[in-house]
Amino acid sequence: MPHVLVRSIVRPDKADAVMATLLDAGYPAVTKVSVFGRGKQRGLKVGDIHYDELPKELLMTVIPVADKEFVVSRIIEAARTGTKGNFGDGKIFVSPVEEVYTVSTGKKEE
């Protein structure tokens, strides 16, 4: 069965909600990495101070391709701020996964 890698870059205060949503939806396997970066807004300016890079959380999970739309919609619901969302809420990237191997056994997963 084909799989995809879903990478979500979300606000730090939304990461736990996204992870809980994925767990509740039946997708417990998530890798979480703290990252810094910027999007189209090129950082944030508060008064005279400019923050070039902002803290975010990168969440990664591999899922069956058939579940892609469902999982992406759950992530959006959990990560969005406000009723319509705001700049800086994040991005979701979906990429095909060619092969998966288990490190402990060295075996290719099907």
Predicted features along the sequence, with ranges:
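Positively charged, small/polar-rich N-terminal and surface patches that mediate targeting and assembly
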Residues: 1-110
